[in-house]
């Protein structure tokens, strides 16, 4: 049933907190895809994960997703005893190499003040902006971008 905006105030509805199950995810994806298509955009959401191992032990991982024309790094973790040994840098390079030549514009990531801001800058990321946490500066969010050739 189509609802005109002028009739919306007459629609009875309830809003509840629910688990994000497959039914809700399917609804969200379907509606987003329709809206994107109506605007001539293709999302192509594709999650990724690369894992570093040593002697069958996971020592690092990077995960995220590519969609629209961007790559988003959600998580980058290196086991504490292996930090500072180039593993994180190699994981970033692996992401770059995996998406090289596929038409992506940039890689985005976000980190907190207590995390690895210097690391991302060392890897060639530029700081776009900082979202300040007024109660705890360690939780300031640093938003980084790296443009691809």
Functional labels for PLM-detected ranges:
Residues 88, 92, 113-116, 133-140:
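Short glycine/proline-centered loop/turn elements that form peptide/ligand docking sites
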Residues 99-112:
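Conserved GNAT acetyl-CoA-binding A-motif
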Residues 84-97, 122:
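Conserved acetyl-CoA-binding loop-helix of GNAT-fold acetyltransferases
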Residues 14-74, 114, 131:
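Acetyl-CoA-dependent GNAT
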Residues 108-110, 126-143:
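Conserved catalytic-core motifs of GNAT/GCN5-like acyltransferases
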Residues 76-78:
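Hydrophobic adenine-recognition pocket in adenosine-nucleotide-binding enzymes
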Residues 66-74, 83, 136-140:
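A conserved beta-turn-beta hairpin within the catalytic core of GNAT-like acetyltransferases
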């Amino acid at each position: 049933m189509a609802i005109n905006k002028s009739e919306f105030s007459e629609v009875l509805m309830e809003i509840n907190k629910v688990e994000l199950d497959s039914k809700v995810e399917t609804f969200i994806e379907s509606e987003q895809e329709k809206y994107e298509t109506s605007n001539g955009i293709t999302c192509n959401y594709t999650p990724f994960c690369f894992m570093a191992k040593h002697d069958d032990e996971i020592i690092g991982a990077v995960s995220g997703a590519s969609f629209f024309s961007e790559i988003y790094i959600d998580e980058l973790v290196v086991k504490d005893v292996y930090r500072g040994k180039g593993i994180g840098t190699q994981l970033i390079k692996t992401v770059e190499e995996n998406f090289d030549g596929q038409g992506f514009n940039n890689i985005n990531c976000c980190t907190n003040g207590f995390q690895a801001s210097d690391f991302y800058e060392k890897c060639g990321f530029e700081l776009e902006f900082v979202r300040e946490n007024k109660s705890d500066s360690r939780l300031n969010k640093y938003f980084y971008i790296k443009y691809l050739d």
